[in-house]
Amino acid sequence: LSPGGRLRRISLEWHAPAPSGLRPAIAVNGSGDCRVTEGRRLIYGTDGRAEALEVLSADLADVVFREALNPPVPAGPPTAQGAVRVAVIDTGVNYTLPLFAGRLARDGAGGLLGYDFWDMDARPFDVDTARSPFFPLHHGTAVTSIVLREAPGAVILPYRYPRPDMTRFGDMVAHADRAGSVIVNMAMGSNAEADWRAFAQAAKARPHMLFIVSAGNDGRDLDKTPVYPAALGLDNILTVTSADADGRLARGSNWGASRVDVMVPGEQ
């Protein structure tokens, strides 16, 4: 609804029966006058997981665009010895993009180092369905591209964070440690300290690893109203906030005299 109460758009979802219960199948979006503007349909594989999202035309007859949700990892050569391995814990990475060819950490057989701790498989593809299965977000790919731009000599270990079970964070940190990563980028956070207990325990046990975490963008003082893991207070956590082009705190960025360590340009 608009501020004046006028209907601006409408969205309908249909969830279909599946062996594990109802699962999202199709969404139809319409304008304020109830005309269909597009449809979105999820395609499932034999394992019951969504493998593609199809965007449909207004009459729902044609597929306008098809987005893969869990494609195979392309083959690649083993990682060169001595390359700095940076773990990016986020929503995954779109490893099918040419941008990342040769920049993802791999073992001696060419297998991708990294893991999907959300779906618990070896395909950490960038899909965040937390808000809607029909409108997934792709935060991790953007973050990873920035890391590679700023650190051209690094290779990436992509991880998809364990939203269904945050206790898996302990296993994820251990996985990154075994894979040879001592730098971990985590542009994420939440208000619930309990969500981060497994991470805190694993990080504290590994002082040789540095975890670079975002302060967040809620426009608040973390010393008074904390966000985690930024406010965990571990010696091997570096909490970073954003500056604008003039070197001032960027609009909406969090701050904190004791909780935030560094402010860097982050608006461009």
What is each of the regions a protein language model found here?
Residues 90, 109, 227-268:
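Extracellular S/T/G-rich loop segment that most often corresponds to the catalytic His/Ser-adjacent loop
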Residues 94, 123, 149, 162, ...:
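Active-site/binding-pocket entry motifs
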Residues 87-89, 115, 157-159, 212, ...:
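Hydrophobic/aromatic beta-strand patches that form the interior of the parallel beta-sheet core
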Residues 78-81, 149-151, 177-178, 204-206, ...:
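Extracellular/periplasmic catalytic domains that process cell-envelope and extracellular macromolecules
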Residues 70-154, 171, 175-182, 246:
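Active-site core segment of subtilase-fold serine proteases
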